[in-house]
């Protein structure tokens, strides 16, 4: 098939993997210098929305690739790959306007839409008096469709959404019309038929639908969101105050990220997959499971130089919803502090099988080898 270019502020690993599987090129357009910036004293007065799309890069990429080769523009809220950082309403509006200027659908990966709305409410001018639901309504007003895993801001054990705006840019670009402009193939109906024939009629039991009906409203509760984001910030500040290098500040909406290049003082090369070594030692020594979302998961070694520059070599500490106490977080802070002191002993990792498998971090095997 055709090699399309699909720009985003940050494709998540599975999204990027699926784009590559269909023979197209994912691009992540964000401000890496801003992301790694450490504020004076560890805190910003207002969140700088480090998850924003770099709109200058977006327009330049569309012009370089040609609008006909860009089937959609994709924005992830919050930006999981870019350390869970939020996207401002102004940036959503601007990114959508650029996409529409070239007749391109603007899509959202909205798995963490409520957390993003919380950051807008508490940091962006003009939104302090608006409810989470009102802010969400405006966020979604700028897109032509969205995907969302509802195990995140749906507060449910399963479920997801693929939604398209009626008569939006996606519908116009991917439906078929006759000479008089009448619809001959409606892409929405086509996708629904494919979904039913592949997965059954929505595939949910009544229990799951009821959980989602409650969960989507629960996620709009301001005090719940405030507690969740505060836990993330508490963990990040605990790492920072203990002198651990590489902590991304401020914390995102669902977790804390550590830049492995900084953590290891720039001494580990990309092919060492040291973030995986960090993850291995943290669970082996202290029973704490984290996710490497850097050189290994994002397949740094298989990318072009311009794509490599868009990789954040990080490890993610995702915070369980409404489960952890301050004592849990204090234990994590203490454990990572001890591991940081002994970071020279953390092994490197090599792939022993499945190096070129699609989405290899789900399938491949690794083994540790000593750091020398």
Predicted regions and their residues:
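Conserved PLP-enzyme active-site core in the AAT-like
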Residues: 1-244, 269
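Glycine-rich beta-alpha junction loops
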Residues: 77-79, 112, 152-154, 252-254, ...
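Short, conserved charged micro-motifs
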Residues: 78, 265-274, 322-331
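Extracellular structured ligand-interaction cores
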Residues: 159, 253, 314
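Short beta-strand-to-loop capping motifs
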Residues: 164, 258-261, 319-321
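Conserved small-domain helix->loop->beta segment predominantly found in fold-type I
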Residues: 200, 204-280, 284-311, 347-357
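PLP-dependent enzyme catalytic core of the Aspartate aminotransferase-like
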Residues: 219, 285, 297-372
């Amino acid at each position: 098939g055709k090699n399309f270019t699909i720009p985003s502020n940050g494709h998540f690993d599975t999204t990027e993997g699926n784009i590559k599987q269909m023979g197209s090129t994912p691009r992540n357009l964000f401000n890496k210098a801003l992301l790694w910036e450490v504020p004076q004293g560890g805190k910003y007065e207002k969140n700088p929305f480090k998850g924003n799309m770099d709109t200058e890069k977006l327009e330049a990429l569309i012009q370089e690739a040609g609008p006909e080769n860009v089937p959609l523009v994709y924005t992830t809220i919050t930006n999981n790959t870019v350390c869970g950082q939020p996207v401002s309403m102004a940036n959503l509006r601007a990114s959508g306007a650029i996409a529409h200027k070239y007749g391109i659908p603007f899509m959202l990966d909205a798995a963490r839409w409520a957390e993003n709305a919380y950051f807008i409410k508490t940091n962006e001018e003009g939104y302090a008096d608006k409810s989470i639901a009102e802010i969400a309504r405006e966020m979604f007003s700028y897109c032509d469709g969205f995907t969302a895993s509802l195990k995140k801001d749906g507060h449910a054990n399963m479920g997801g959404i693929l939604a398209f705006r009626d008569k939006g840019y996606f519908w116009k670009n991917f439906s078929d019309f006759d000479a008089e402009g009448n619809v001959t193939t409606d892409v929405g109906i086509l996708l629904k038929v494919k979904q039913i024939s592949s997965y059954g009629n929505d595939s949910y039991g009544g229990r799951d639908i009821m959980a989602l009906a409650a969960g989507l409203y629960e996620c709009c509760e301001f005090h719940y969101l405030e507690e969740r984001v505060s836990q993330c910030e508490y963990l990040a500040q605990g790492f920072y105050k203990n002198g651990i290098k590489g902590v991304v500040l401020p914390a995102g909406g669902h977790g804390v990220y550590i830049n492995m290049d900084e953590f290891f003082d720039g001494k580990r090369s990309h092919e060492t997959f040291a973030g995986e070594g960090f993850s291995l030692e943290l669970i082996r020594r202290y029973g704490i499971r984290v996710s490497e979302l850097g050189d290994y998961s994002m397949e740094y070694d298989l990318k072009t130089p311009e794509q490599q520059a868009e990789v954040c070599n990080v490890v993610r500490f995702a915070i369980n919803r409404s489960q952890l106490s301050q004592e849990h977080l204090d234990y994590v802070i203490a454990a990572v502090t001890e591991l940081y002191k002994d970071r020279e002993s953390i092994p490197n990792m090599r792939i022993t099988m499945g190096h070129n498998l699609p989405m290899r971090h789900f399938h491949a095997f690794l083994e540790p080898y000593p750091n020398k």
